[in-house]
């Protein structure tokens, strides 16, 4: 399967890319590198055992996202391109809203335009706040 991983050069995204590559999937990594480094890409490929395509870009650019999804014949999107620092989100709420909410909506709109129907969204355990017991209970 041809999979686009947004935020794919971040910590969780890069580990996901390695697993996808090891299982024979074709991986396209999209990242704006605001919280990651380009130097992780050769590591992803070495551990994954094959090459991945890297595109530096932003999920908020809907026209470019539609083009990427179409041009690379993407079949599924795994979305990790969210800002997650709790303290910073309080200091910069509009920036976080723009990236996390507006960006995700633009990504989904681009997916609809390109006919991509498979979507996995990753959140953060921080949405549960400080819990006294692990594992967290979601009910």
Curated annotation (Swiss-Prot):
Its cofactor is NAD(+). One of its GO terms (cellular component) is cytosol. The active site is at residue 136. GO terms for biological process: galactose metabolic process. InterPro entries: Epimerase_deHydtase, NAD(P)-bd_dom_sf. Its EC number is 5.1.3.2. One of its GO terms (molecular function) is UDP-glucose 4-epimerase activity. It comes from the Bacteria. Transmembrane segments: none annotated. Pathway: Carbohydrate metabolism; galactose metabolism. NAD(+) binds at residues 11-12, 31-36, 58-59, 80-84, 99, 124. Pfam families: Epimerase. It catalyses: UDP-alpha-D-glucose = UDP-alpha-D-galactose. Keywords: Carbohydrate metabolism, Galactose metabolism, Isomerase, NAD. Substrate binds at residue 124. Homodimer. Belongs to the NAD(P)-dependent epimerase/dehydratase family. Involved in the metabolism of galactose. Catalyzes the conversion of UDP-galactose (UDP-Gal) to UDP-glucose (UDP-Glc) through a mechanism involving the transient reduction of NAD. PANTHER family: UDP-GLUCOSE 4-EPIMERASE. This is UDP-glucose 4-epimerase. It comes from Klebsiella pneumoniae. The gene is galE.
